């Protein structure tokens, strides 16, 4: 069976599967029925002695590991979690094995069955999850600590110690890893009856995050000696802001390195593609080249996620809708039936998805900027009203009434004002824009703790402004990578056209008079070359989006770069002809 036909069937199957998922999501009765069947089937599988033993053995091994990184997975929760993983991995492995058997039959190659059997290793995912969480925890604490420090600064200004700030964090939704740490410290205080000094020192001795350990040790020492904790917190905020700036500088250096690697790959990849297309094991070489590009893209995505500092937990991402995925698959299917090749339907489908999903993602990123940019001015306006004796509630209402902000910002603040008009005492918001929600969480804490001097509000405004400026600096410094992304498909096409022109000139014998290659050798592999141009363009744009925004949401750029790639591909023959006649002297 031809690989293109097989991929076509795979896409059709995926489309039907997504359609079923959409029906289950929209139809309540169908969803409930499927849920009951799923639970019954799950209980039946996990009730088997073999799977039950796997779950308990893995849980007994992983509980100490999770406790060592202070992750909240108790024995019962961990059993349920591992049971779910074992169940899903079993289903996944069964389907993978069935698919590998079909592929082995279609291609008459039993080696494919081996890959289906390997899919059963997905049952070990809880161990991978532990390793991922272990790295995520340290990064998360670094990202959250400067904001928690200011939360504690607000509490300290009103005469309350760190335990009050920890309680506030637990009752909120803004922090993840600091929230976990807060639960551990408060458990020592309230259940194990330890004093604050011993609780903080013990927690500091059990953490590997250097900045966090120093933060706790310093606070505990000054608390025990009766020093000025407000001054200490002010100093720590400056230290943590400088640490954030340092990590951003490191990230920008890595971003420049990644951009250079992308350009190098763009130049090398056409050579690899054309050489692999004419080797004895062309199919295997092509598969390796394509797989290497996928692995590189995924590896870069993880590397960027690991290196790029976040604002707290980061903003809530816009997820693709099932309808968008189904539409993309339908576009691919229709284009494949009409055009009878693979690269062009994939290009059209990717442009379709990048446009419809990218538009929503672009709108979300624009909304984030519209909510973040007025925050420093807004907080300073509140500080001005506080200086005249107004409460936080009154200052928010007056700022919205008398000051000028953009419409999106005013709309979200109006939600808070409406709550206040109904005698609500909760100022917190849930927009999904982390920095905006954090500012209102601080205002809520100021109101409830009885603090909120003009000075502390000005310091909050300055800190938020510094954070926004650093985020803008990242976007500005990575702008070059965006410009190079537009050039990448042109560069890929130019290198490819140059090689094709040279090889076809040699094939025609114009250089030496000897026919070394058949004339049609390169024409047959054009579809593969075009597919790699599209894949390389998509990879470059995806990586650039992660570098600039820290998010895959800005896929609108992908539709533009893919359109450039498509235009370059359509002009490939003309470019080859021009190079043959002008550079290599062919007639």
Task: Provide a role label for each language-model segment.
Residues 5-9, 154-261:
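Membrane-anchoring hydrophobic segments
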Residues 27-62, 202-228, 425-453:
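Short, non-transmembrane cytosolic segments of multipass membrane proteins
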Residues 70-94, 255, 259, 325-336, ...:
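Loop-to-transmembrane boundary segments
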